[in-house]
Curated annotation (Swiss-Prot):
The SOCS box domain mediates the interaction with the Elongin BC complex, an adapter module in different E3 ubiquitin ligase complexes. PROSITE patterns: SOCS, WD_REPEATS_1, WD_REPEATS_2, WD_REPEATS_REGION. This is WD repeat and SOCS box-containing protein 1. Interacts with DIO2. Component of the probable ECS(WSB1) E3 ubiquitin ligase complex which contains CUL5, RNF7/RBX2, Elongin BC complex and WSB1. Component of a probable ECS-like E3 ubiquitin-protein ligase complex which contains CUL5, RBX1, Elongin BC complex and WSB1. Interacts with CUL5, RNF7, ELOB and ELOC. Binds to HIPK2 through WD40 repeats. InterPro entries: G-protein_beta_WD-40_rep, SOCS_box, SOCS_box-like_dom_sf, WD40/YVTN_repeat-like_dom_sf, WD40_repeat_CS, WD40_repeat_dom_sf, WD40_rpt, WSB_SOCS-box_domain. Pathway: Protein modification; protein ubiquitination. GO terms for cellular component: cytosol. Probable substrate-recognition component of a SCF-like ECS (Elongin-Cullin-SOCS-box protein) E3 ubiquitin ligase complex which mediates the ubiquitination and subsequent proteasomal degradation of target proteins. Recognizes type II iodothyronine deiodinase/DIO2. Confers constitutive instability to HIPK2 through proteasomal degradation. The keyword Repeat applies. GO terms for biological process: intracellular signal transduction; protein aggregate center assembly; protein K27-linked ubiquitination; protein polyubiquitination. One of its GO terms (molecular function) is ubiquitin protein ligase activity. Keywords: Repeat, Ubl conjugation pathway, WD repeat.
Length: 421
């Protein structure tokens, strides 16, 4: 068994070195809580980075301060970096000038994180109520944490204070995602087999339950225009939901094992899913077609072997913001960087016991969390996107596949716009 296709010379693949790391604190800690770093997240505006460092705690650090420390000290631990001064408004509209690091004790094992930002003119989708307990400012930045006991806690990023405690799930909250449109609509995925939709502008009202999964739900992700949601889970499940009507659009068939991670491309034209079957699939979410397969074990395993303990479980997948690259993390102690038009990785990096990964807001850095609660960072593959690709992304942001196929243009151009060449 090999990690790369036979035609690929493993020695010719570029191997990256970390540019920095954030190490988990040492003991003593409550031994009842694990050290695993199940989730990492970057703020939408690139101002903060958060990760669950195990032992019930989440650490928030100014991202620019992290980068400065990486440049000054290489891969030294920067968990004690100094605070960064940036202007902000609190929930009451007052000015604060000292956003800084925060260590948040969430009270239970943290399985999921998500940043959410507020756009005041975006009205609540639920009801029009004149009075609210919380009125979020224009530059409000929130952090949602999903816990082992089924609770979701909402924190003010700038102060580290608890704002809301959302209670409705009965099992682990495995993933969280905010709608990118600034509406502060939050979706949670849980081991209780449900997804729940929360309206934080309506004081955290739980407005909808999405049912359809027959087993654990591992992950969920909004499309860039917030109109579609992907959820993935055990028993090969990949579901797409209409988030205007809160109805299921379709179920995607193809994986042979639990599907544990998903992410949309920046233009919403592609969907990446990662599975324990050793594969990452790139889908067209508008028609359910598989456009590309990224294998992590060769020769490709049979469905029976892929559906078992194959030692190549893919744990996480993330789309870069250039729309050209995808990162995946697997149990073979390797992080892979892929181009969407190549079926082999263009760069790799060693990582033992990895659990999660995410690109920074500008796509220049990849962060990955591990079993021991630490985070490692790599500079990502960079290239100037072609004008053709930029035009394709602009078109696909506003036009689904069905409308593209109806355009009176040459077939080769249709294939390019549909990501088939």
């Amino acid at each position: 068994m090999a990690s790369f296709p036979p035609r690929v010379n493993e020695k010719e693949i570029v191997r990256l070195r970390t540019i920095g790391e954030l190490l988990a604190p040492a003991a003593p800690f409550d031994k009842k809580c694990g050290r695993e770093n199940w989730t990492v997240a970057f703020a939408p505006d690139g101002s903060y980075f958060a990760w669950s460092q195990g032992h019930r705690t989440v650490k928030l650090v100014p991202w620019s301060q992290c980068l400065q420390n990486f440049l000054l000290h290489g891969t030294k631990n920067v968990t004690n970096s100094s605070s960064l001064r940036l202007p902000r408004q609190n929930s009451d509209g007052g000015q604060k000038n000292k956003p800084r690091e925060h260590i948040i004790d969430c009270g239970d094992i943290v399985w999921s994180l998500a940043f959410g930002s507020s756009v005041p003119e975006k009205q609540s989708r639920c009801v029009n109520i004149e009075w609210h307990r919380f009125r979020f400012g224009q530059d409000q930045l929130l952090l949602a944490t999903g816990l082992n006991n089924g609770r979701i806690k909402i924190w003010d990023v700038y102060t580290g204070k608890l704002l809301l405690n959302l209670v409705d799930h009965t099992e682990v909250v495995r993933d969280l995602t905010f709608a990118p449109d600034g509406s502060l609509i939050l979706v949670s995925a849980s081991r209780d087999k449900t997804l729940r939709v929360w309206d934080l502008k309506d004081d955290g009202n739980m407005m909808k339950v999405l049912r359809g999964h027959q087993n654990w739900v591992y992950s969920c992700a909004f499309s860039p225009d917030s109109s579609m949601l992907c959820s993935v889970g055990a028993s090969k499940a990949v579901f797409l939901w209409n988030m205007d009507k809160y109805t299921m659009i379709r179920k995607l068939e193809g994986h042979h094992h639990d599907v544990v991670a998903c992410d949309f491309s920046p233009d919403g034209a592609l969907l990446a899913t990662a599975s324990y079957d050793t594969r990452v699939y790139i889908w067209d979410p508008h028609n359910g077609d598989i456009l590309m397969e990224f294998g992590h074990l060769f020769p490709p395993p049979t469905p029976i072997f892929a559906g078992g303990a194959n030692d190549r479980w893919v744990r996480s997948v993330s789309f870069s913001h250039d729309g050209l690259h995808v990162a995946s993390l697997a149990d073979d102690k390797m992080v892979r960087f892929w181009r969407i038009d190549e079926d082999y990785p263009v760069q790799v990096a060693p990582l033992s016991n990895g659990l999660c990964c995410a690109f920074s807001t500008d796509g220049s850095v990849l962060a990955a969390g591990t079993h021991d609660g630490s985070v490692y960072f790599w500079a990502t593959p960079r290239q100037v996107p072609s004008l053709q690709h930029l035009c394709r992304m602009s078109i696909r942001r506003v036009m689904p596949t069905q409308e593209v196929q109806e355009l009176p243009i040459p077939s080769k151009l249709l294939e390019f716009l549909s990501y088939r060449i």
